[in-house]
Amino acid sequence: MKNSFNQNNYSYWIFDLDNTLYPEDDNIFSQVKMKIIKFISLKLRLDLKNADLERQRLYNLYGTSLRGLMTEYKIIPNKFLDYVHDIDLSAIIKNLDLNVALQKLKGEKYIFTNGSFKHAENVLNQLGIKDNFKSIHSIETCNYI
């Protein structure tokens, strides 16, 4: 059976950011997860084990830890996002092959992420592919849901 996929049939491309445009084994999300636990620990005065349990509870109940923190604890979302995305991105290397592949795709390209706009910009710059995207749709543009 012949593959009928033709990239020229598409006008828009939407890319997820984290663990999609760079390898999961770069351990970026594990850093974010640890920062979420530390944030909860600091703000709620919990040890790390109980902070992680609270993170999981909020995630399961609200779909994101942030939504739970906003709802139950009135946490200001930008303070949370700035804290949890203050991470080391040095494991992400410039990806020239990805840049070329993105340039070859016809149509507008967008990033969609449940991370912050600033985090998305930082990752895209680290990868060397930011200029390929028309815009970034982040957790802020989605009203933190």
Question: What does each model-found stretch correspond to?
Answer:
Residues 107-111:
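Short active-site oxyanion
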Residues 97-106:
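Catalytic-core regions built around general acid/base machinery
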Residues 113-115:
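Conserved phosphate-coupling serine/threonine residues in phosphotransfer and NTP-handling enzymes
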Residues 117-145:
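Substrate-recognition "cap/lid" segment bordering the active-site pocket of phosphatases
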